[in-house]
Structures are given as C-alpha cells and as structure tokens.
C-alpha cells in the first residue's frame, strides 16, 4: 500500500540532471516513503525532459511534469540483499556466499549476480588469527632496495672470495624465485572474503621480489657472470611448485624451507665478507621470519581443527624425499662457497673452521625444523625423523 505524503520541495536552481542534479532529487526521495511526492524546481531548460526520463529509469513516476512520485523499485532491489559477514577479522564467515564473489567483507550484497567460485573458500583451510597483525607488521616494515642498502659501500675482496659470494647469491636468487611463485599461485585461488590472508601472501610475494632483486644485484655488482645452477637444486625446488595443496605447500615452503633459510641467512649475516652482503641478508631474514610465522600460525590453526592434518604433512615430507632420492641435493659449489666464506682465507686451519661452521649451520637447521615440527604436534622422535628427510638443498 502506497503512502500519500505532503509535498516536499527541492530547488535545483540552474543545476541540470546531466550535471549531477539527480543526486539532489535522489537524496530527497530517500527521505520519504513509497508513494510520497517531491516537487522539483529549477531553471535548467531541459529539466522537465530529463526529469521524466530519469524517474522512469529509477522506477518512479512523474505527474504535472515536475512532481516525482517515489516508486518501490529501489527498495525492492535490495530486499533480498545480505551482509557479507563483518568488516573486522572476527566477521569472517566459515563459508562465503556463492554469489558474494569479490564483494568487500561486510558489504551489503545485492541478490543475484554471477556465481564466482574459488578453490579455497573454507575458512579453516586458509585462516590464521595472526594474519591481520602479520600484515600490519609487514606493511610497516617494507624497505626500498635502493635506499636501505648502501650499494656504494667500499670493500675489496680477493677474486676467489668474490666468486664464492656470487655463487651463494646465485643460489639465493634461484630459491627466492620459487618462494615468490608459490604464494602468488595461491592468491587467485583463495576467496577474497579472507582478505587478510590475501594481504599476507601478496606482501610475502613482494618481499621475495625484493630479495630476488638485491641478491641478483649483489651477484652482478662487480660485473662478472653469475654462478652455476645445479640440476639437483632445481629438482628440489620443482617439487614445491608442483604441490597444489595450500596447507602442504605452506608446510614445505614456509615451515621447512624458509624456516631452514632463516638459519642460512643468519649464517651469511655473520660470515659474509662485505657490508653489502651482510646488509641484504639481514634485511631478507627479517622478512622471512614473518613468512615462517604465518605458515606456522596457519598450520597450527588447521591442525587444531583437523586431526588428520599431521598424517598428510608427514606423507608430503616422505613423498618429496622419495622424489628427490636420486638427486645430489645441495650443489657442491654452494657448499664449498659457504665453507670459504666462513673460513675467510685459504689457510688449512681456516678452512677447517669454515667447514665446521657449515656443519654447525646444518645442525642448527635441523634443530629449528624439529622445534617447528614439535610445535605442530609431532612427537619428538617423529619430528627428528621427518627433519632428517628434508631436502639437502635447504629449501
């Protein structure tokens, strides 16, 4: 039943509907019920022609050329709308509506529209309560490779030591490229309702892009060619690219791979022979720590809800180990370069110290993996066994 109200009046003066006058009329109509009349005045010569056309397009009627009678079309349009959860992180729903698509979380979603499906649209498969805080930290910690690193810092290295640095940097670039591709692949598969997760993965990819830049830039700093890329290392990294499951990919890359890399970057921060290499590995290490933290938080959340997750994680480690059994693992040139960097010279005693330092690094990597596995609920003996199966290529 329509409601007949006393006329309201709006004066557009010289403003035409083709210049924004419709906004004032629409605003006036929103304040009256269906069936109410609004008198529209103005001195634009096309007002009456435009008013009739606009009113019909909006489901209203016009009488006497200047009185708009509010229709019900606008109200009816939103009668079946629903809220897409709430704006805040605790407003994320378990399963977003099939027609919500890319609507912002918390928006009022008009009924209808296309059904947009995402592979990962179950909150438990992607969520971490830590994601909003990690994203905020990451956004506040972004650094510019051109200004955060003193690229013209003076240093002079023997040719063999410079070659060792170049080899390690070449290896780091190779690994960082994969560390960028993996999260980037999942960005298009996760429902945007879980925007904090997308933000974390997006900034993670941006982090890796910077790491690729600074490591490649240091490798080429003295104008020589880059180092070698071993087939075994590339085979190890390919297994990360071939993993389609988000939880398993996060586990293999972030918890095991990048977690192991934290130790390597810390090692280089101490033993790198020049200030630029020490600086860029320190910067990268800060970023990688966030990546590991998100991977752990996500898997801890999922493990608390899915008792079968640990069996799947175990199977992923074993499957990857079996696939890489025939490969040589870490490139010998990379291992030797790490020894030389830790040694600092070609003296036998120095080389012995360098070799011991790399062995200690590998033990620290193993200890770190075991601690993270225990945090995910694996018994200590199983954590030790699974850590031992991790790729010899570190990542």
Where are these regions (language model features)?
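Intrinsic disorder
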Residues: 1-52, 56-106
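Terminal targeting/low-complexity segments that flank the catalytic cores of oxidoreductases
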Residues: 24, 75-199, 220-221, 225, ...
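Short glycine-/small-residue-rich flexible loop motifs, especially phosphate/cofactor-binding loops
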Residues: 52, 216, 266, 370
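Alpha-helical transition-metal enzyme core signature, strongest for iron centers
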Residues: 55, 172-180, 201-219, 251-262, ...
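Short glycine/serine- and small hydrophobic-enriched flexible loop segments
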Residues: 185-188, 266-270, 297-300
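Active-site-proximal alpha-helical scaffolds that flank and shape metal-associated catalytic sites
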Residues: 217-289, 319
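A beta-strand-loop signature enriched in Asp, Gly, Thr, and Trp
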Residues: 280-284, 291-320, 324
């Amino acid at each position: 039943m329509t409601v007949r109200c006393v006329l309201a009046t709006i004066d557009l003066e010289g403003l035409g509907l083709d210049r924004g006058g419709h906004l004032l009329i629409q605003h006036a109509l929103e304040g009256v019920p269906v069936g109410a009349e609004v008198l529209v005045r103005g001195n634009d010569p096309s007002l009456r022609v435009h008013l009739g056309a606009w009113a019909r397009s909006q489901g209203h009627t016009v009488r006497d050329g200047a009185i708009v009678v509010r229709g019900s079309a606008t109200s009816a349009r939103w009668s079946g709308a629903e809220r897409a959860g709430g704006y805040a992180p605790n407003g994320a729903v378990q399963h977003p509506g099939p027609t919500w698509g890319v609507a912002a979380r918390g928006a009022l979603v008009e009924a209808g529209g296309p059904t947009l499906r995402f592979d990962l649209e179950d909150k438990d498969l992607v969520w971490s309560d830590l994601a909003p805080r990690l994203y905020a930290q990451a956004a506040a910690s972004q650094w510019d490779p051109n200004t955060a690193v003193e690229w013209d810092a003076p240093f002079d290295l023997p040719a063999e030591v410079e070659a060792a640095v170049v080899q390690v940097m070449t290896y780091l670039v190779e690994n960082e490229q994969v560390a960028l591709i993996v999260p980037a692949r999942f960005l298009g598969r996760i429902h945007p309702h879980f925007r904090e997760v997308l933000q974390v993965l997006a900034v993670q990819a941006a982090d890796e892009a910077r790491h690729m830049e600074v490591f490649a830039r240091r490798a080429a700093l003295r104008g020589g060619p880059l180092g070698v890329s071993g087939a075994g290392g590339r085979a190890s990294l390919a297994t990360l690219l071939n993993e389609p499951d988000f939880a398993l990919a996060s586990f293999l890359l972030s918890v095991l791979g990048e977690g192991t890399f934290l130790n390597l970057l810390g090692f280089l921060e101490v033993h790198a022979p020049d200030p630029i290499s020490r600086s860029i590995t320190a910067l990268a290490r800060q970023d990688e720590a966030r990546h590991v933290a998100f991977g752990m938080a996500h898997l801890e959340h999922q493990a608390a809800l899915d008792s079968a997750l640990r069996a799947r994680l175990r199977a992923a480690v074993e499957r990857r180990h079996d696939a890489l059994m025939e490969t040589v693992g870490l490139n010998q040139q990379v291992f030797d370069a790490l020894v030389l960097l830790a040694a600092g010279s070609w003296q036998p005693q120095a080389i012995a110290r360098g070799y011991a330092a790399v062995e200690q690094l590998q033990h620290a990597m193993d200890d770190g993996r075991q601690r993270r596995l225990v945090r995910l609920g694996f018994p200590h003996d199983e954590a030790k066994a699974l850590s031992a199966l991790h790729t010899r290529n570190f990542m």
